[in-house]
Amino acid sequence: DRKTDIAVFRDGDWYILQSSNNTFRAQHWGAPGSDTAVPADYDGDGRADLAVFRAGAEASSPTYFFILRSTSNTEQTQQFGTTGTDRAFPADYDGDGKADIAVYREAGGIWYILQSSDNNLRGAQFGLGNFQDQPVPRDYDGDGKTDLGVYRKSSGTWYLLQSTAGFAGAQFGISTDLPVPADFDGDGKSDLGVYRDGTWYLLRSQLGFGAFRFGLAGDTPIPSVP
């Protein structure tokens, strides 16, 4: 219904409160303790699909995406990534309306994207790696494609590689802030935002700077970046 549903992922089980009919749904998809939830619309039907990212038992072993497609109720298993260095950041990087399988490799700050539009592998070095940057992929220029982005924790600086508008950099935040990029002013572009001890600091593309108190120190802000 184009509305985000309240949901939690617990030890391989999904608990979802569906906004369309206010009914509760529970479904098992994933392994207890080891999987990371990576829900996204992988098949382009307008509904988020249940999906998990699973690391291997040993360093340098392959990682896998396990996706339950909502359109066909079929499973997609995709080996993609390496244990110990890669983190999953699926999003629609090619603008075809489907989330692409993607990882950010801390060894070198390299993005690897499996584009759903043509099944081609795209690689791009953007970021320092070695856990110095927090990946923050979002659509910052409003062209319908997710842009590569990192938040450099040491300086509070944002570095964006926008698919249409090109490179951009901005200092916004301090080293202890949590990045919370999202479209806070409704213009179709993600805005820069950080959360600091219960205060949201936003740099909005239309409305400019704003600071709002909501939450307590130690809270996890939503939206947040994994």
Model-derived features with residue positions:
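Trp/Gly-enriched beta-strand/coil motifs that build multi-repeat beta-propeller-like domains
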Residues: 1-226
